Amino acid sequence: MAINISKQISSMKSVIITSFMNDPNIVSVIDNANVEDPQDLEYENIFPTWRIDTAELEKRTVISVKISTTSSKKSDVVQRFFVDVLIFTSQELQKVPRTSVARGCTRIDYLAQRVEDILNRSTEIGLGEAHLITNEEDSIDSRHPARMMRFEVLGFSSNYVYL
């Protein structure tokens, strides 16, 4: 039976999103007073889809995840996956309180540090280690600073067959 790449992507996203929601520092810096259980941050502040909807998310901090892959050759057993993480917030929320775990950092820079700590060199989401390949400061628009990060992960190709 061949590996289903879409199923592999869904599984990777689930592991990544869960690790973000289980990180008390990420939960603290996202600072959503409407959420009591960190698992409720999914689809509120942490999205397993690419999400840039600044009208709805005007005063919110968001982490969204996208996973893509390149086509593999018929002979490839291992396939490269790219995990893209977009972190953005409104300009008004960039500064974090001095008492926060993120003191001395902007909100998106601190969240990027935590994401990198969780994903870079992680062996939880693929075969071998995930590797950070880009980490770029950007903005969604004039009111929403952002950080884009890309990790490379190896997984099984759809050509791989269990024996």
Question: Which residues make up each language-model segment?
Answer:
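Acidic-leaning, charged glycine-interspersed low-complexity segments
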Residues: 24-28, 104-159, 163
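Active-site-adjacent structural patch at catalytic or cofactor/ligand-binding sites
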Residues: 65-97
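Small/polar-rich, solvent-exposed N-terminal microdomains that initiate assembly or binding
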Residues: 1-75
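Residue-level detector of alpha-helix boundaries and kinks
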Residues: 1, 5, 99-100, 136
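Short linear functional motifs in flexible/disordered or boundary regions
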Residues: 32, 89, 97, 127-128, ...
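Short histidine-centered catalytic/ligand-binding loop motif
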Residues: 94-107
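A general secondary-structure signal for short beta-strands and their flanking turns/coil
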Residues: 60-62, 76-82, 142-148
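Short, well-structured alpha-helical interface segments that form or flank functional binding sites
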Residues: 11, 60, 80, 106, ...
